[in-house]
């Protein structure tokens, strides 16, 4: 949350680093929106966030739809398993890019590939595989400068944007780069969802092959680059410091 205690990091340095993180975070968020829309076309329950899945589980149990309830429970457990895998692979609360992120991305790509094959064959076992990929992605991104970076749902993003705007109205200083960062993630998720619906209408579950391939290739490149030390992901990105502001006094 933007109002939590920030990590002890120089604001200008934080801004320079977030410029490197923004493209990846936007792609993550767009991928989650795409995957969630595609999965919704197969089974009317979200896989990128668990609030809707838990509600669907309760509805199915009440209606006595045991097969659907089992699928909903599998989605929830799959998401949990993905977060568990991220905890084992990445093992950090704070955002520290390294080779393990490349491995985690390749695992996510493998899970989406598995889900693509299963869903194309009409097997619901593809649903927990998709949810596991989303849980893995959501847990890969973590805390940075007081922001909880989550890329598979937008409830937290909208909450944080609202809180920051409220602080601004109350004449409290806010960091505009954080607000822009959250707005980019929100927009990316929506655009990804829109593209996902179009792809699902045309290709069905096979559309999941696109993010599966993207995650696999991106993970391999990330691992290679960090393994060979070819680039410092946290190098200086520019001279502009972060801008802060508060609601103008009357």
What are these regions (language model features)?
Residues 2-250:
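Alpha-helical transmembrane segments of multi-pass membrane proteins
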């Amino acid at each position: 949350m933007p109002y939590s205690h920030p990590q002890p990091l120089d604001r200008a340095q934080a801004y320079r680093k977030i410029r490197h993180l923004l493209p990846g975070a936007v792609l993550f968020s767009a991928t989650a929106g795409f995957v969630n829309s595609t999965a919704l076309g197969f089974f009317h329950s979200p896989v990128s966030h668990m609030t809707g899945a838990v509600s669907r589980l309760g509805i199915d149990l009440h209606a006595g739809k045991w097969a659907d309830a089992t699928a909903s429970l599998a989605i929830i457990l799959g998401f949990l398993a993905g977060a568990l895998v991220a905890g084992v692979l990445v093992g950090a609360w704070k955002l520290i890019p390294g080779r393990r992120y490349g491995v985690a991305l390749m695992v996510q790509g493998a899970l989406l590939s598995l889900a693509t094959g299963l869903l194309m064959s009409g097997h619901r076992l593809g649903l927990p595989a998709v949810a596991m990929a989303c849980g893995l992605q959501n847990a890969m991104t973590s805390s940075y400068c007081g922001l909880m970076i989550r890329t598979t749902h937008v409830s937290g993003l909208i909450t944080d944007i609202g809180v920051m705007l409220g602080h601004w109205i109350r004449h409290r200083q806010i960091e505009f780069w954080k607000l822009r960062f959250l707005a980019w993630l929100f927009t990316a998720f929506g655009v990804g969802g829109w593209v996902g619906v179009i792809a699902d209408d045309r290709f069905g579950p096979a559309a999941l092959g696109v993010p599966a391939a993207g995650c696999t290739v991106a993970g391999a490149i990330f691992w290679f680059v960090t393994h060979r030390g070819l680039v410092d992901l946290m190098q200086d990105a520019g001279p502009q410091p972060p801008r802060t502001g508060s609601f103008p006094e009357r």
